[in-house]
C-alpha cells in the first residue's frame, strides 16, 4: 500500500469512527434527556454501540501490519476488553445490564474518549493538530479512563453474578479474565501516562 493511499485510508477510518461515536453520544444523551430511563437508553443504543465497537477490530490489523505505530499488544488489550463487554456481557446478559446506570456511565466515558481519540488521529494525519485537541487527548483520560474501566468492571461483576444461575462461557472464562483484566487496565493507563509525559516534555521544549 502506497504512503498516500495508507494516509487517506486511515483518515477516512478515523473520521468515520469519530462520527459514529458522536452518534452514540448524541443518541445516548437525547434518549436519556427525554426518558431519564436507563433501560430505554440501553435498548435504544445497545446494538449501535456493539457494532461501532466491533469496527475497532480493524485497529488490531492496523497495528499488526504496521499501518500505525501503535503497539499490537496495547491495541489487542483495548479492543478485546471492549469486545468482551459488548458481546460477552451486555449482549447475553441484557436483562441484568439494562436497568443499570453503570451502563450509561460506561457508554458516556467510551464515547467522549473515542470522539477525542479519533479526531486527534485524523488531525494528526493531516499534520495540524489543534492545541485544544492535544490537551483533551492527554488530560481527559485521567478522569474518563477510571470511569470507563470502573464501569466495565462493575458490569462484568453483574454478569458474573447472573451467570451463576445459567450455563455460560463466562463461568469458564471468569478466572482467566480476572487474572488478565487488572494488569491489562494497568498497562493501558500507564501507557497513556507515558504518552502524556512525552507530550508535556515536547511542549516544554518548544517553549524554551
From Swiss-Prot:
Name the UniProt key words of this record, in alphabetical order.
Answer: Endoplasmic reticulum, Fatty acid biosynthesis, Fatty acid metabolism, Lipid biosynthesis, Lipid metabolism, Lyase, Membrane, Transmembrane, Transmembrane helix
Tell me how this protein sits in the membrane: Multi-pass membrane protein
Q: Which reaction does it catalyse?
A: a very-long-chain (3R)-3-hydroxyacyl-CoA = a very-long-chain (2E)-enoyl-CoA + H2O
Q: What is its EC number?
A: 4.2.1.134
Under the GO molecular function aspect, what terms does this record hold?
3-hydroxyacyl-CoA dehydratase activity; very-long-chain (3R)-3-hydroxyacyl-CoA dehydratase activity
Q: What is its main location?
A: endoplasmic reticulum
Q: What positions does UniProt annotate as the active site of this protein? A: 145, 152
- Where is it located? Endoplasmic reticulum membrane
Lineage top rank: taxon: Eukaryota
Q: What is this protein called?
A: Probable very-long-chain (3R)-3-hydroxyacyl-CoA dehydratase
